[in-house]
Design a protein with these regions (language model features):
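Short pre-active-site segment immediately N-terminal to the catalytic Zn-binding motif
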Residues: 166-186, 218
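Short Gly/Thr-rich strand-loop-strand
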Residues: 352-357, 389-435
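Pan-zinc metallopeptidase signature
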Residues: 255-374, 378-381
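Post-HExxH zinc-binding segment in Zn-dependent metallohydrolases
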Residues: 76, 197-201, 205-249
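Bacterial signal peptide processing site
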Residues: 18-21
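C-terminal motif of bacterial Sec signal peptides marking the signal peptidase cleavage site
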Residues: 14-16
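Catalytic zinc-binding patch centered on the HExxH motif and its immediate surroundings
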Residues: 103-121, 142-166
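Extracellular mucin-like PTS domains
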Residues: 27-46
């Protein structure tokens, strides 16, 4: 279940959505970001092809930095330091591309990581999981193509957590950065400063090595909130004429294909709900409070619901049993956070109901099983903050299933408890008042056998 969802979270690091809205003059209302934070594991190797062209590690042309641009960078760095109250430990590293070159870099770095991140058959299982959850009908090949396009079109700039390089597309043959480019660079310079203060490279490496990204969404949201705020401060210095000029300088970032809506769900957390939380933190303690928040690791639930951030509501660890199943073995397991619930539910029941359910999450765990045919069997166990919140989460998943024509609903019988939704994917749901349990399988005979097996001291469904 989670491997692919996690990968989309990492994907969001690679390239964040570029939205069309302009920053509001009131700096307390944080502007919409136009850039992203990246995590490609490659390091930049600048090579001299000849005396006129310099390229990066993928052979993509890097543009020269004029003395005027260097002076602009110095001024923007000073601005970021003044607004954050923090100081760079070293001069930020940056690469400048043409727009097409930047898109080529985004795609190439993703494909380079793809080959390193996925073992044989793992990508196919990941996409099968997305199919079973009803997020997409795409094949593994088509999904890969969509994500490559997503990389190409969804970002106006990036900061790489690992090699700590800021990358921004600019116009060729100009001696000075235009206003749009400077605004994007301000945002990315904040990320560069955050990376130096916190050592984001080490933090990300630890998450990747353990394959546990539970702490990522919350910190990412705080990082984007601060970067958006500083960017809004910079844009607030522009008069109405310069704002219009900056808007006219914005490149066309539209995607050439229609991308699935759920691709953007993590960005709603980082740039919308995160901005709201960041605004409250800033209102309570100004920039010093945001600086302190960078060291915290809020849950996604705390970002969706700021009052839970300030009350420091804890995440509850939920134990789930690894079952002994004929012909199936455990392939992966992990924990669930509120972003996962919204990610699974939103496209079927809407954002409002999905988020309302997610902010009642106590905790959750999942286990994926696979057989020799690479068929998946997935189990999920969820707790709520209280019985009412658990019931709301249960109702949300039942509505999720009821709204899908691919399912036929079957009530429980004498052999098993809960509700079974039958179809090409079979979905079982049971709420015992303490935990919500879910199971998914593409084999109805296996599912019925699983639900009816109480030959041991406990039924299978007591996982």
């Amino acid at each position: 279940m989670r491997k692919y969802i996690n990968y989309l979270l990492v994907l969001c690091l690679v390239s964040s959505c570029t939205l069309d809205t302009e920053a509001e003059p009131e700096v307390l209302e944080t502007s919409t970001t136009t850039s992203s934070t990246t995590t490609s594991s490659t390091t930049t190797t600048v090579q001299n092809i000849d005396e006129e062209i310099v390229v990066d590690e993928f052979g993509i042309e890097l543009l020269d930095v004029s003395p005027e641009m260097k002076q602009q960078f110095d001024e923007l760095i000073a601005f970021v330091e003044k607004r954050t109250g923090l100081t760079y430990s070293e001069y930020p590293k940056f690469n400048l591309y043409t727009l097409e070159g930047y898109r080529d870099y985004s795609a190439a770095s993703y494909l380079d990581d793809f080959e390193k991140d996925y073992e044989e058959g793992e990508w196919e299982r990941a996409v099968l999981s997305e199919n079973m959850w009803g997020l997409t009908n795409a094949s593994p090949e088509k999904m890969k193509e969509l994500i490559v396009e997503f990389q190409r079109c969804a970002s106006a700039g990036s900061y790489n957590l690992l090699d700590q390089i800021l990358r921004v597309p600019i116009k060729r043959n100009q001696t000075k950065l235009n206003l749009w480019e400077q605004s994007v660079i301000v945002h990315e310079l904040v990320h560069s400063l955050q990376g130096q203060i916190i050592d984001l490279s080490e933090w990300y490496t630890t998450m990747k090595d353990s394959d546990d990204f539970m702490n990522y969404p919350g910190r990412r949201s705080i990082m984007e909130a601060q970067a958006d705020l500083v960017q809004a401060y910079w844009e607030s210095n522009l008069d109405s004429y310069d704002r219009q000029r900056m808007a006219s300088e914005r490149p066309n970032f539209r995607c050439s294909v229609s991308l699935p809506e759920y691709f953007y769900i993590p960005f709603d957390l980082y740039y919308d709900f995160g901005a709201r939380l960041g605004k409250q933190i800033h209102s309570n303690g100004r920039m010093e409070a945001l600086n302190e928040a960078l060291y915290k690791l809020p849950t996604a639930e705390q970002v969706y619901s700021p009052e839970k951030y300030f009350s420091e509501e804890p995440y509850i660890n939920v134990e789930i049993k690894n079952l002994e199943l004929e012909n199936f073995t455990v392939i992966d397991q992990g924990q669930i956070d509120s972003l996962d619930l919204v990610y699974l539910l939103q496209t079927k029941i809407g954002q409002k109901d999905a988020v309302n359910a997610a902010i009642g999450l106590g905790g959750g765990s999942w286990v994926d099983y696979v057989n020799e045919s690479n068929d998946l069997f997935m189990t999920v166990k969820i707790s709520g903050d209280d019985v009412n919140e658990l019931n709301e989460i249960s109702d949300a998943f039942q509505n999720w299933a009821d709204f899908q024509t691919r399912f036929t609903k079957s009530l429980s019988n004498s052999s098993w408890k809960g509700i079974l939704y039958e179809g090409d994917t079979n979905f079982w749901i049971y709420n015992d008042g303490n935990f919500l349990r879910l199971a998914l399988s593409n084999d109805i005979e296996f599912m019925l056998s699983f639900l009816s097996d109480c030959s041991n001291e406990q039924c299978n469904t007591s996982f």
